[in-house]
Amino acid sequence: FIGLLISAGKAIHDLIRRRH
């Protein structure tokens, strides 16, 4: 569960950083 949360958070963070 924690691994999935970290993966999702990392993916979201990457998406936000790419959008900027």
Curated annotation (Swiss-Prot):
GO process terms (BP) = defense response; defense response to Gram-negative bacterium; defense response to Gram-positive bacterium; hemolysis in another organism
| Annotated function | Has hemolytic activity against human red blood cells. Seems to disrupt the membranes by adopting an alpha helical conformation. May play a significant role in innate host defense.
Q: What main location does UniProt list?
A: secreted
Q: Where in the cell is it found?
A: Secreted
Tissue specificity, per the record, is: Gill.
Query: Where in this protein does the record say Histidine amide is found?
Result: H20
Entry GO CC: extracellular region
For this entry, the protein name equals Chrysophsin-3
* Record-stated family: Belongs to the pleurocidin family.
What organism is listed for this UniProt entry?
Pagrus major
Q: From what superkingdom does this record's organism come? A: Eukaryota
- Nucleotide-binding recorded as keyword: no
Determine if NAD is one of this entry's keywords: no
For this UniProt record, the keywords arranged alphabetically read as follows: Amidation, Antibiotic, Antimicrobial, Cytolysis, Hemolysis, Secreted
